[in-house]
């Protein structure tokens, strides 16, 4: 399993995600995360990767430049390593 740490306005939340599992499937039970479409087509769930890698290829909202800057759509992100993500970043776009 990969260790996921979400840095939320309410503090850090850490949990394990199995390979191939979307972090939101566990994360939404652990934290009050902003969600809307849950399909990677909007920016409600936007976060920023501090460390680690995720697969967010299902998403359509972010362009390559935003992804290179570390932005991530947490609703579709599948961790590919231990990962630390700052949540609640929609206002930055």
Swiss-Prot record:
One of its GO terms (molecular function) is metal ion binding. Residues 2-91 form the 2Fe-2S ferredoxin-type domain. Keywords: 2Fe-2S, Chloroplast, Electron transport, Iron, Iron-sulfur, Metal-binding, Plastid, Transport. [2Fe-2S] cluster binds at residues 37, 42, 45, 75. Binds 1 [2Fe-2S] cluster. Its cofactor is [2Fe-2S] cluster. Its main location: plastid. It is found in: Plastid, Chloroplast. GO terms for biological process: electron transport chain. Pfam families: Fer2. SUPFAM superfamilies: 2Fe-2S ferredoxin-like (SSF54292). Transmembrane segments: none annotated. GO terms for cellular component: chloroplast. Ferredoxins are iron-sulfur proteins that transfer electrons in a wide variety of metabolic reactions. Belongs to the 2Fe2S plant-type ferredoxin family. This is Ferredoxin-2. It comes from Equisetum arvense.
């Amino acid at each position: 399993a990969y260790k996921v740490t979400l840095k939320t306005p309410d503090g850090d939340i850490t949990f394990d995600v199995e390979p191939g599992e979307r972090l939101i499937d566990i994360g939404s039970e652990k934290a009050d995360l902003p969600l809307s479409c849950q399909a990677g087509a909007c920016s409600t769930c936007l976060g920023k990767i501090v460390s680690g890698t995720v697969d967010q290829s299902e998403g359509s909202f972010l362009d390559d430049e935003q992804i290179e800057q570390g932005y991530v759509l947490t609703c579709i992100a599948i961790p590919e390593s231990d990962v630390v993500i700052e949540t609640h970043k929609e206002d930055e776009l």
